């Protein structure tokens, strides 16, 4: 092909065999059906930690808002956040103050989360290599993991390209039936105290703040 193409493009994708402990599941759904399906799957699997990937900042925030409205503890991570807010989000997710992190690919660069049980592609990535990087965040350090991908009709071509590039047959699943929505509550709560020596704060002040919070 190099003799007939002026500048042939070679696409290299990490072998899916390099991710043997990851189970991949694909669900066909409409755009409107993605949020209800996500809520059902979170209720079904009850992950201790989950990252949901979106392709845009707008979708990232709207998905996060919808999950929180349904009692699923979620945080958003996207480019519109200030660095301080981004850092606080990562700390809260790492210590269990939220069980779901809804993120864009750009904001999630360099994100390293231990024992991540579930990755959800709310939208299929445009680039198959990005898909591999997304799902590769689970099943680390010898652990197993689950990667779930949603596919709306307009994303069918991306699914076909993904199957071809990874040389795998996609595992299409039926939506779960008879699943009751169960709140995905956070295991911990994080207190953000904006003060210190200059504010003349003492350890006892922090303790009293925690006691007051527990009484609310």
Name each region found by the language model.
Residues 21-68, 209:
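Conserved interdomain hinge at the start of the Helicase C-terminal
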Residues 1-18, 160-169:
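Post-DEXD/H (motif II) to motif III coupling segment of the RecA-like Helicase ATP-binding lobe
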Residues 109-124, 146-149:
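A short beta-strand element within the Helicase C-terminal
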Residues 211-216:
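Conserved small/polar residues in nucleotide/adenosyl-binding loops
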Residues 61-66, 72-104:
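Conserved helicase ATPase core of P-loop NTP-dependent helicases/translocases
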């Amino acid at each position: 092909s190099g003799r007939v193409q002026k500048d042939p493009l070679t696409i290299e994708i990490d072998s899916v065999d390099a991710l043997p402990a990851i189970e991949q599941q694909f669900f066909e759904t409409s755009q409107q059906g993605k949020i209800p399906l996500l809520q059902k799957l979170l209720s079904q699997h009850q992950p201790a930690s989950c990252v949901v990937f979106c392709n845009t900042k707008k979708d990232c925030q709207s998905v996060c808002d919808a999950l929180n409205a349904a009692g699923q503890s979620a945080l958003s991570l996207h480019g519109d956040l200030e660095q301080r807010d981004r850092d606080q989000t990562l700390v809260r997710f790492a210590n269990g103050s939220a069980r779901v992190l809804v993120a864009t690919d750009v904001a999630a660069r360099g994100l390293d989360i231990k024992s991540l049980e579930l990755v959800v592609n709310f939208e299929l990535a445009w680039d198959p290599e990005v898909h591999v990087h997304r799902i590769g965040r689970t099943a680390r350090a010898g652990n197993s993991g689950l990667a779930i991908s949603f596919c709306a009709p307009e994303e069918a071509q991306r699914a076909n390209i993904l199957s071809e590039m990874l040389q795998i047959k996609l595992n299409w699943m039926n939506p779960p039936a008879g699943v009751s929505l169960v709140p995905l509550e956070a295991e911990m709560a994080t207190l953000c105290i904006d003060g210190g020596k200059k504010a003349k704060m003492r350890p006892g002040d922090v303790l009293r703040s925690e006691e007051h919070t527990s009484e609310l």
